């Protein structure tokens, strides 16, 4: 299988194409790396291909914050410039500039 190149980077703020949530990327798997049960739980009309990057997000919607795994095909850049209000942001990232978060080097 060919190595996939990720379209998004750690720290990028993104939004879901089909569902009303957004988040910041904190990790990436370059191909599907979750359970088959999780995969089958995704509605068929938006179920992604497995041969693409999957991003781990600190996510939020109007009601809650949570962590989400989302395929590249279901993500868009979030250009709202609004910060993500997730309680784990400060544990992973040092700050925000424009539409992305960054980590300071150790």
Please give the residue ranges for each predicted region:
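Surface loops and adjacent helix of pleckstrin homology
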Residues: 26-28, 69
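Intrinsically disordered, low-complexity segments enriched in polar/charged residues with Gly/Pro
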Residues: 1-3, 43-45, 88-89
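Short amphipathic alpha-helical leader/targeting segments
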Residues: 25-26, 37
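Mixed-charge, Lys/Arg-rich low-complexity intrinsically disordered regions
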Residues: 1-13, 18-22, 29-32, 103-106
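Intrinsically disordered, low-complexity boundary segments flanking structured domains
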Residues: 12, 41-46
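Generic alpha-helix detector with strongest preference for long hydrophobic helices that associate
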Residues: 4-6, 38, 73-74
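Intrinsically disordered, low-complexity, charged/polar segments
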Residues: 47-106
């Amino acid at each position: 299988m060919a190595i996939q190149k990720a379209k998004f980077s750690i720290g990028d703020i993104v939004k879901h194409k089909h569902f009303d949530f957004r988040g910041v990327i904190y990790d990436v798997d370059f191909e599907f790396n979750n359970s088959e049960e999780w995969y089958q739980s995704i509605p068929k009309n938006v179920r992604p291909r497995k041969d693409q990057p999957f991003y781990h997000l600190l996510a939020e919607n109007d009601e809650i914050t949570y962590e989400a795994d989302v395929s590249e095909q279901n993500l868009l850049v979030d250009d709202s410039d609004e910060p993500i209000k997730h309680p784990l942001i400060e544990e992973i990232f040092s700050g925000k500039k424009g539409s992305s978060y960054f980590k300071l080097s150790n």
